[in-house]
Amino acid sequence: MASQGTKRSYEQMETGGERQNATEIRASVGRMVGGIGRFYIQMCTELKLSDYEGRLIQNSITIERMVLSAFDERRNKYLEEHPSAGKDPKKTGGPIYRRRDGKWMRELILYDKEEIRRIWRQANNGEDATAGLTHLMIWHSNLNDATYQRTRALVRTGMDPRMCSLMQGSTLPRRSGAAGAAVKGVGTMVMELIRMIKRGINDRNFWRGENGRRTRIAYERMCNILKGKFQTAAQRAMMDQVRESRNPGNAEIEDLIFLARSALILRGSVAHKSCLPACVYGLAVASGYDFEREGYSLVGIDPFRLLQNSQVFSLIRPNENPAHKSQLVWMACHSAAFEDLRVSSFIRGARVVPRGQLSTRGVQIASNENMETMDSSTLELRSRYWAIRTRSGGNTNQQRASAGQISVQPTFSVQRNLPFERATIMAAFTGNTEGRTSDMRTEIIRMMESARPEDVSFQGRGVFELSDEKATNPIVPSFDMSNEGSYFFGDNAEEYDN
């Protein structure tokens, strides 16, 4: 992992703070989630939601989306300048589900964005509380990562659909700041850069003039973010080449795709945070919990504790399996879409199955779905153990590459081997090592070839009992070395469509 010299911890990024000590970080993260909770309670009052309706995850998501839309400056400005039929740029809303005479009903609500902003600021001591907004974006992003596949997006940019484990955070909006950049996977950054380069190839003026200068700054910043995720000198050197290119074109796209592939074995460091739905924070605040005083961390025991004591409900379609719906939301809550299923199952204390075996669709209900047949059930979001979230890719002993099955990006800091099919990955690297990046490419391939699937990552790290809040007694699980690792195996999920 890169030295902590200039880096801020995720929580500092999350709360926009400068360097703080652990207690200050815990307090400011606590203030952030407490503000989300207070906002949620106020919205439930405004909408006259019953206790049960306020615990419905679909209602939580609608309320979260409303506040994100109310603060989306860029889109608001765009909507005002390009009035479209039937869209009031000053209003935001969505479906709210209510229980009436033993049935669920959908009600579409509309609110003034100004009013939503007022309620949000009031819940956050009069501040804009951008950190809280980013936190909600990351929760939505983690939910998308667990729910949808990005095959189409990968293929469009010339990447291999099997690289899905690199796509964490691919649906995060551009405005998600440093906290958002920290949770983006290598593939996500590569895809953003490739899109940018392609626009430059097709549009001669993209890099020119005053606008072009801004574009260039954005390009270099994205390159630096991606460079910071790589852990080997050769990968970083290659990123320098891509960043310094005079006018980026197909050579850079090639280099980026090469780097993305290499990240399947030489994994990048990608942050993981447990971001929970707003209703969970609301429940805790309503029960009198003082987040700011108690302090809170997104990467420790706190989210597990919170989920242990929260009852959240979800609408269930006629042929969906409530246990599977629970698994989906559990994975989203812990940002574990790309984690090894053996590790997730052990921590959760229940078997976590690959997505192809889930009988459940996404959490959100489309406006044309029939409410007559909708039921609701409790989401089982509790866990048997807790573990610390990681921001490293789990590469063994410092700089050496370690194994990485074609789809694992570790979430939990727990000892395991990272099973992978070297033949499958290496097949993508035949030939092309000429050109200006040849020596780096050769070096990267050499490191990948020396990686062994039996090497152990996160040596000595274990899970903890939920009573062990100070993390004193690690329980190191032993996993069979079989390739049971990938959530995306035999995948049949829907595509993510904006």
UniProtKB/Swiss-Prot annotation:
The domain of life for this entry's organism is: Viruses
Q: Which Pfam families match?
A: Flu_NP (PF00506)
Unconventional nuclear localization signal (motif): residue ranges: 1-18
**Which keywords does this Swiss-Prot/TrEMBL entry list?**
Capsid protein, Helical capsid protein, Host nucleus, Host-virus interaction, Ribonucleoprotein, RNA-binding, Viral nucleoprotein, Viral penetration into host nucleus, Virion, Virus entry into host cell
Q: Which GO terms describe its molecular function?
A: RNA binding; structural molecule activity
UniProt keyword RNA-binding, yes or no: yes
List the InterPro entries hit by this protein, alphabetically.
Flu_NP
Motif segment (Bipartite nuclear localization signal):
198-216
As for subcellular location, the record says: Virion; Host nucleus
Description of post-translational modifications: Late in virus-infected cells, may be cleaved from a 56-kDa protein to a 53-kDa protein by a cellular caspase. This cleavage might be a marker for the onset of apoptosis in infected cells or have a specific function in virus host interaction.
Q: Where is this region: Disordered?
A: 1-21
Q: Which GO terms describe its biological process?
A: symbiont entry into host cell; viral penetration into host nucleus
- Any single GO CC term annotated in Swiss-Prot or TrEMBL for this entry: ribonucleoprotein complex
- Family in the record: Belongs to the influenza viruses nucleoprotein family.
What does the protein in this record do? Encapsidates the negative strand viral RNA, protecting it from nucleases. The encapsidated genomic RNA is termed the ribonucleoprotein (RNP) and serves as template for transcription and replication. The RNP needs to be localized in the host nucleus to start an infectious cycle, but is too large to diffuse through the nuclear pore complex. NP comprises at least 2 nuclear localization signals that are responsible for the active RNP import into the nucleus through cellular importin alpha/beta pathway.
Q: How does it assemble?
A: Homomultimerizes to form the nucleocapsid. May bind host exportin-1/XPO1. Binds to viral genomic RNA. Protein-RNA contacts are mediated by a combination of electrostatic interactions between positively charged residues and the phosphate backbone and planar interactions between aromatic side chains and bases.
Record's protein name: Nucleoprotein
Q: Which gene encodes it?
A: NP
